[in-house]
Swiss-Prot record:
Family annotation (InterPro entries): Membr_insert_effic_factor_YidD
Family membership: Belongs to the UPF0161 family.
Top-level taxon: Bacteria
Topology versus the membrane: Peripheral membrane protein
Keywords from the UniProt entry: Cell inner membrane, Cell membrane, Membrane
Organism lineage: Bacteria, Pseudomonadati, Pseudomonadota, Gammaproteobacteria, Vibrionales
Biological role stated in the UniProt entry: Could be involved in insertion of integral membrane proteins into the membrane.
Subcellular location per the Swiss-Prot or TrEMBL entry: Cell inner membrane
Covalent S-S links between cysteines: none
Name the UniProt record assigns to this protein: Putative membrane protein insertion efficiency factor
SMART domains, per database record: Haemolytic (SM01234)
């Protein structure tokens, strides 16, 4: 059974979804990665919890720039001790 998400994870996912619904359509596709950075952030928050999910999302956003080729960059698998409680 999956571990329930913390309220902070839900809040962060909600903020990313608001970005996907309202801001992303205005600026168009710019992400160099698959999955997109916003989808990656949601997957990381769901899989790893708030703290590690935010850390992974921040690292991913810092890699998403014109000098990086991009490509396929999935969320790393969950280690048992990594998941926030």
């Amino acid at each position: 059974m999956a571990t329930p998400l913390s309220p902070f994870s839900w809040l962060a996912i909600g903020i990313v979804k608001l970005y996907q619904w309202f801001i992303s359509p205005l600026i168009g596709p710019r992400c160099r990665f698959t999955p997109t950075c916003s989808t990656y952030a949601i997957e990381a928050l769901r899989a790893h919890g708030f703290i590690k999910g935010c850390w992974l999302s921040t690292k991913r956003l810092l890699k998403c720039h014109p000098l990086n080729e991009g490509g396929f960059d999935p969320v790393p698998p969950v280690q048992k001790q990594d998941r926030d409680k």
